[in-house]
From Swiss-Prot:
Belongs to the derlin family. Residues 1-21, 118-121, 174-244 are cytoplasmic. May be involved in the degradation process of specific misfolded endoplasmic reticulum (ER) luminal proteins. Coiled coil: none annotated. The gene is DER2.1. This is Derlin-2.1. It comes from Arabidopsis thaliana. It is a multi-pass membrane protein. The chain crosses the membrane at residues 22-42, 97-117, 122-142, 153-173. GO terms for cellular component: endoplasmic reticulum membrane. GO terms for biological process: response to stress. It comes from the Eukaryota. Pfam families: DER1 (PF04511). It is found in: Endoplasmic reticulum membrane.
Amino acid sequence: MAQAVEEWYKQMPIITRSYLTAAVVTTVGCSLEIISPYNLYLNPTLVVKQYQFWRLVTNFLYFRKMDLDFLFHMFFLARYCKLLEENSFRGKTADFLYMLLFGATVLTGIVLIGGMIPYLSVSFSKIIFLSNSLTFMMVYVWSKQNPYIHMSFLGLFTFTAAYLPWVLLGFSILVGASAWGDFLGMIAGHAYYFLAFVYPRMTDRRPLKTPSFLKALFADEPVVIARPEDVRFAHAPFDEIHQD
């Protein structure tokens, strides 16, 4: 069993493996009280006035306490991050990393701008961890890239992957969990998909070009293509995106 897990881990592409490792280490560290979540959450005031720039990154790595909800999020992170990196971004590691950086920037911008809007500032001020939103962004982009793959929800009904984000969003609402994480992830995912794939076909222009310094970091090598199968899944609530 341990050998199988080790082999599965080693076969992950570099970005997926790095992000999954950072997320697990950060969350486990907080659970063991080695790291404090108070040093990780997104706080614009501390970032600007006290130069705690690491918060712009660490808020994407913490998935709250170690429980079933955490395992669900790790499943979605490992599965869809890996599928994207090995299929849609095969041989384009730098482009995949740029997608994540773009998504993180959009999500952070939404929270910062939302915090300055009257009547919305209170709600946005509670969004201090965006890890779930970034994961949902990957799910959204994957669903747009693979719209015809058939999926099963709890064995109750089947649907095509194009509807996966909406099924997950609806399930969050159905169980009474906050859908903010899902919704923000959908916004970031749609922004990337439109600018990276739709707009270039419409205008023959590419507004999202991966910086050369990122391309220089990775040698684009062919990887084994992951073949997604029909899956049965349950969606964990995203209520931890809000903090009281």
